[in-house]
C-alpha cells in the first residue's frame, strides 16, 4: 500500500523531533560542551595540580567536620553552595570563608537550569551571589550548574556576565556501587585523577557519610602521588599565566 506524502512528511517530522530532542539531551548533560562561553571540566597542564570541589550545603555539623579535615591536611577547596541552604546556614558559609576556602554558586534552588526563563536563571544566580557576599566572600564567584545541566539560556547568561561554567572530570560518588564504600571512592579517585583534574564530591547530606570519610584518604593518596591542591580560581590562573615549560589551556571537545 502506498504511503501518502502527508504521512511521509509526518514521519520525517517525528523522526527529526526525536533526533533534536536526543541531541539536546546529550548537550544538556555534557561536561565538555556548551553553545556559549567557556566550559571547564579540567585544565590541560603538565603540572600535578588538582582542584577539590564540594557541591551543595552548607550543612551544620558536616561543614565543621570537613573543614577540620581540610585544615589538618593544609588543603584549600572550592564549595559550590546552594543559595537556599546558605540562607538557612549563613554562619556555616562564613566559617568556610574564614578558613580560606572559596564559595561558588550552585543556584538558589538547585533546580535543573534547562527549559527555564531568562528571569528565573538570572534570579537563581544573582540571589545566590548576594548570599555569598553576605557570608563575607569577596573574590570572584564561580558557577556550577545543578546536575551539570545546561542548554542555551544558562550558558548565554554566564557568557554575558563573563563567567565560565565549571564542571568536573572526576566524580566518584556518582556511581552507587562506589558511593557506598569510602575505600572504593578513594581508589576510584586516585585511578581517574590526572594533572589538571577537577574532583567533585557530595558530602553535605545524610547518606553521604562514605564520601566524607573518603576525603582524607583522597588527599593523602594524591599527595603521595605528587599532587598539590588548588582552588578553582588558582586552577584558572594557570590558564592565564602558565609557568615555563608547562602547557595550560581550556580543553576543547574532550
Regions found by a protein language model. Name each.
Residues 111-116, 174-176, 201-202:
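A short acidic, helix-capping loop that chelates divalent metal ions and anchors anionic groups
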Residues 149, 155-192, 226-238:
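His/Asp/Glu-enriched short active-site or ligand-binding loop at hydrolase and phosphoryl-transfer sites
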Amino acid at each position: 500500500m502506498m504511503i501518502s506524502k502527508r504521512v511521509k512528511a509526518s514521519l520525517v517530522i517525528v523522526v527529526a523531533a526525536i533526533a533534536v530532542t536526543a541531541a539536546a539531551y546529550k548537550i544538556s548533560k555534557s561536561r565538555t560542551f556548551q553553545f556559549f562561553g567557556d566550559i571547564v571540566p579540567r585544565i590541560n597542564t603538565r603540572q600535578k595540580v588538582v582542584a577539590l570541589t564540594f557541591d551543595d550545603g552548607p550543612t551544620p555539623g558536616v561543614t565543621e567536620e570537613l573543614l577540620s579535615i581540610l585544615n589538618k591536611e593544609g588543603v584549600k577547596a572550592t564549595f559550590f553552595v546552594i543559595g537556599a541552604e546558605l540562607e538557612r546556614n549563613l554562619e556555616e558559609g562564613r566559617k568556610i570563608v574564614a578558613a580560606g576556602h572559596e564559595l561558588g554558586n550552585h543556584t538558589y534552588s538547585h533546580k535543573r537550569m534547562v527549559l527555564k526563563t531568562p528571569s528565573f536563571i538570572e534570579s537563581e544566580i544573582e540571589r545566590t551571589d548576594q548570599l555569598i557576599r553576605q557570608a563575607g566572600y569577596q573574590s570572584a564567584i564561580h558557577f556550577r550548574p545543578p546536575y551539570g545541566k545546561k542548554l542555551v539560556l544558562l550558558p548565554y547568561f554566564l557568557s554575558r556576565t563573563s563567567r565560565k561554567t565549571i564542571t568536573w572530570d572526576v566524580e566518584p560518588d556518582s556511581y552507587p556501587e562506589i558511593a557506598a564504600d569510602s575505600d572504593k571512592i578513594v581508589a576510584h579517585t586516585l585511578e581517574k585523577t590526572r594533572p589538571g583534574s577537577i574532583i567533585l564530591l557530595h558530602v553535605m547530606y545524610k547518606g553521604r557519610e562514605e564520601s566524607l570519610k573518603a576525603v582524607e584518604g583522597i588527599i593523602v593518596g594524591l599527595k603521595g602521588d605528587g599532587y598539590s591542591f588548588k582552588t578553582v580560581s588558582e586552577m584558572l590562573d594557570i590558564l592565564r599565566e602558565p609557568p615555563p615549560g608547562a602547557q595550560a589551556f581550556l580543553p576543547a571537545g574532550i
